Amino acid sequence: MSNNGLDIQDKPPAPPMRNTSTMIGAGSKDAGTLNHGSKPLPPNPEEKKKKDRFYRAILPGDKTNKKKEKERPEISLPSDFEHTIHVGFDAVTGEFTGMPEQWARLLQTSNITKSEQKKNPQAVLDVLEFYNSKKTSNSQKYMSFTDKSAEDYNSSNTLNVKAVSETPAVPPVSEDEDDDDDGTPPPVIAPRPEHTKSVYTRSVIEPLPITPTRDVATSPISPTENNTTPPDALTRNTEKQKKKPKMSDEEILEKLRSIVSVGDPKKKYTRFEKIGQGASGTVYTAMDVATGQEVAIKQMNLQQQPKKELIINEILVMRENKNPNIVNYLDSYLVGDELWVVMEYLAGGSLTDVVTETCMDEGQIAAVCRECLQALEFLHSNQVIHRDIKSDNILLGMDGSVKLTDFGFCAQITPEQSKRSTMVGTPYWMAPEVVTRKAYGPKVDIWSLGIMAIEMIEGEPPYLNENPLRALYLIATNGTPELQNPEKLSAIFRDFLNRCLEMDVEKRGSAKELLQHQFLKIAKPLSSLTPLIAAAKEATKNNH
């Protein structure tokens, strides 16, 4: 007798799918207006110079320009000078005065209303300052957090902001800095890559900020004749700090040779299969001949890496931070002009595919949150802040395993610097203290986890369809975002979200504390994610 009837009856129901995919650019008719990432990035004027310098580094016989370089007089960079910009706000007219033209253009197209500007002009300036620091360039982000044995290659920006009525200043702000970009208005920040199959194949990335050092303070401006109340005033004082010397290409290559493994990876790995091509290189899957383990190998042409010195940090630190909930670094090799980085491979793709294509229940969301909190508790206990928690950076195994990846914005906290202030990450997931340029600690990751939980509920983070600059303003001023249908959530889930999305950093839960939250006790087995992963993979395949 045939068992076909039984087979059909026993087959589990298909996972609930979203009526329309929330994936930006995945066949949406509105993709053209929402997918800012599809816009071409501006050309990098320094790319040719950097390539030429790198060619000279790896080809010692090339001395074409050395004589000319020697003939040039050495002129040191200016130091200890100040550039003061006065930006005022007239409460009567509702207009900013003395605002740089670049900022004025950004504000004009930001969709931040006049009433919103009048309500909180300081927040407007905060987000303009932040947005300007997030210039998009053709740069790759690396796992650039530092450990005690790795040199800090990041230049430092200092930012102090105080309101007219206040005397204390906000703690200093430190930003990563590149040395060759005066900057034009940046293109709109992409909400997320057009289609995230896996972060291994992701080519749309948020770069590290490239801005001059700023020291910003506020002071009153002269009131208008007919206005008895002085308007809010903001004086921006910019002081150029000395930059740390950058490593030469020769030094970078020498250091890399001392770090990477010796030998031919083509003998250690077999069955190479190309799975992705990005701006920084090509990604393959391969098989470890000795163990049979499937791995991901990213092959990067060093000539095309704009911040080669950060690769050293990446490798040094990745091998120091291994955890079951982190996509682990396995090995690295120099092969000709290429750096090969071998990583753990997860075939299930990113959590983004699941949240945009399927509907997760609370038990499944709790399981993902638990795994992410375990990764964060490990990182935070090792003084590492991830700074870019979002669904794109969570990889899934076909067995339902959940692992955190993409440490390009990580920061190491030293005892001397218990809080960081670098403006990095992806705006829609950012904590308010980051957007408003305050010093921050590991709990910025907890806020981002809360936003990611909203992603799992609604398919996208709050404000994703807003102009990015207005989204930053809303994050800075609205506080905890509102859910579309909070009544559909259990009380313990709402409490978990409130603990993650607490504006007061002191009251916000830590990773260690939240691992004890009652919400995680309803977590389903990780295997419950497998049908969602399979359904999402099928849906994304059909969207291509």
UniProtKB/Swiss-Prot annotation:
Residues 75-88 form the CRIB domain. Residues 219-230 have a biased composition (Polar residues). The modification N-acetylserine is found at residue 2. It catalyses: L-seryl-[protein] + ATP = O-phospho-L-seryl-[protein] + ADP + H(+); L-threonyl-[protein] + ATP = O-phospho-L-threonyl-[protein] + ADP + H(+). The active site is at 388 (proton acceptor). Phosphorylation of Thr-84 by OXSR1 inhibits activation. Activated by binding small G proteins. Binding of GTP-bound CDC42 or RAC1 to the autoregulatory region releases monomers from the autoinhibited dimer, and enables activation by phosphorylation of Thr-422. The modification Phosphotyrosine is found at residues 131, 142, 153, 200, 284. Residues 174-183 have a biased composition (Acidic residues). The modification Phosphothreonine is found at residues 84, 184, 211, 218, 224, 228-229, 422. Residues 1-77, 161-193, 212-250 are annotated as: Disordered. The keyword Transferase applies. It is found in: Cytoplasm; Cell junction, Focal adhesion; Cell projection, Lamellipodium; Cell membrane. This is Serine/threonine-protein kinase PAK 1. Protein kinase involved in intracellular signaling pathways downstream of integrins and receptor-type kinases that plays an important role in cytoskeleton dynamics, in cell adhesion, migration, proliferation, apoptosis, mitosis, and in vesicle-mediated transport processes. Can directly phosphorylate BAD and protects cells against apoptosis. Activated by interaction with CDC42 and RAC1. Functions as a GTPase effector that links the Rho-related GTPases CDC42 and RAC1 to the JNK MAP kinase pathway. Phosphorylates and activates MAP2K1, and thereby mediates activation of downstream MAP kinases.
